[in-house]
C-alpha cells in the first residue's frame, strides 16, 4: 500500500510473512526511528528475541529466552511462524533452525533474523533484498556439501 511506504520510507510488506496489517501493527509499536537503539542487538533484546545469558568469570551459567511479553516481538514471532511453509530462503532458514533448536527456538531465531532485517531497512532506508539472504543460504549449502564430502573421504580412508 502506498501509505505504508510514505509512513516508513521503505516497503516492509515486501518481507516474506509480512502483510499490510502486520506492518502497521509493528510500526505502531516500534516507530520508524531506529536511533533509539545502539545497534540491532539492543533492538532484538528490547523485543525479547535475544537470549538472556548469565555469565560469571567468563563461564556461561545459563542462557534462556526471556519470559516477558513484548507486543512487537510477538508480531515478529507470528510472522516467523507463517514463514515456516514458504519456499524462499527465510523458509529454508526456519527449517534449518527447527532441526537444530526445535519449533519454539526456530520461531524465535527466525523472528530475530526478521528483527535484524527490519532494523537495517529502517535505519539505512533500504528496500528488502532477498538476494543477500539467498547468497548466504547458497554459501551455507556449499559449505555443508564440502563438509559431507570430507566426511565421505575420511570414511573411505578408514
Summary of predicted features, one role per range:
Residues 1-158:
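A detector of single, family-specific signature residues
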Amino acid at each position: 500500500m502506498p501509505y505504508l511506504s510514505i509512513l516508513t520510507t521503505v516497503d516492509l510488506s515486501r518481507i516474506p510473512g509480512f502483510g499490510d496489517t502486520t506492518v502497521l501493527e509493528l510500526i505502531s509499536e516500534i516507530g520508524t526511528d531506529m536511533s533509539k537503539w545502539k545497534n540491532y542487538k539492543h533492538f532484538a533484546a528490547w523485543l525479547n528475541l535475544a537470549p538472556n545469558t548469565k555469565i560469571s568469570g567468563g563461564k556461561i551459567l545459563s542462557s534462556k529466552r526471556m519470559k516477558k511479553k513484548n507486543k512487537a516481538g510477538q508480531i515478529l514471532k507470528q510472522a516467523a511462524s507463517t514463514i515456516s511453509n514458504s519456499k524462499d530462503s527465510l523458509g529454508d532458514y526456519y527449517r534449518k533452525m527447527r532441526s537444530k533448536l526445535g519449533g519454539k527456538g526456530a520461531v524465535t531465531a527466525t523472528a530475530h533474523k526478521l528483527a535484524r532485517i527490519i532494523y537495517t531497512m529502517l535505519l539505512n532506508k533500504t528496500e528488502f533484498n532477498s538476494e543477500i539472504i539467498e547468497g548466504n543460504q547458497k554459501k551455507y549449502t556449499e559449505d555443508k556439501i564440502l563438509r559431507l564430502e570430507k566426511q565421505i573421504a575420511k570414511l573411505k580412508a578408514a
